Amino acid sequence: MFRSRSISLKLSMMGAALLLIIWHSRSASSEVPEGTWMFANRVAVQVFECSGQLCGRIIWLLRPRTPAGQPDLDTLNPDPSLRQRHLCGLTIIWGLQPGAQGHWTGGSLYDPQDGVTYDVEAELTTPTTMSARVYRGTPILGRTEILIRDPQLSFDGRC
């Protein structure tokens, strides 16, 4: 009799724990990833809603100036007419559309470090962590970037 209750209690506790895990993962992934996100502690991007999609612009750079003290420009852009744009304030993510719960697909990411525009998909893995798959053509040949959200980020005017 006690053994039966013990097993029943363990099963109930395991079921409750499983429901809590499922509820937590759904609540984390149903959030919209608007806010400030850090890429590799070098770039902060503000992700925002734009015409029903997600976009992102650079709001902070670890090194916003050239060694000569000039603002960093988009010098590697394949379009010569855009090479004088400042990196600070530059929109580098656009077109991300909501897909399955917690996923955004169909977006583009412009990387000013190489002047290439990539396809991007994103998934909010926790309320403070986003995984972005960056690729050209097929996702399997791309790279994954982990972004960290921190609403308390303090910027010292480096952008």
Task: Indicate residue ranges for each PLM-predicted region.
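Structural motif
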Residues: C50, T125-T126
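Central antiparallel beta-sheet cores of small beta-barrel/beta-sandwich binding domains
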Residues: E34, F39-D119
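N-terminal helix-cap/turn-to-beta initiation motif at the start of protein domains
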Residues: W23-T36
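Bacterial N-terminal signal peptides
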Residues: S12-I22
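Low-complexity, intrinsically disordered Gly/Pro/Thr-rich segments
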Residues: T128-R136
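Bacterial N-terminal signal peptides that target proteins for export
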Residues: F2-M14
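Residue-level recognition of beta-strand termini and adjacent short loop/turns
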Residues: A100, T126-T128
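Edge beta-strand at a domain terminus
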Residues: G137-C159
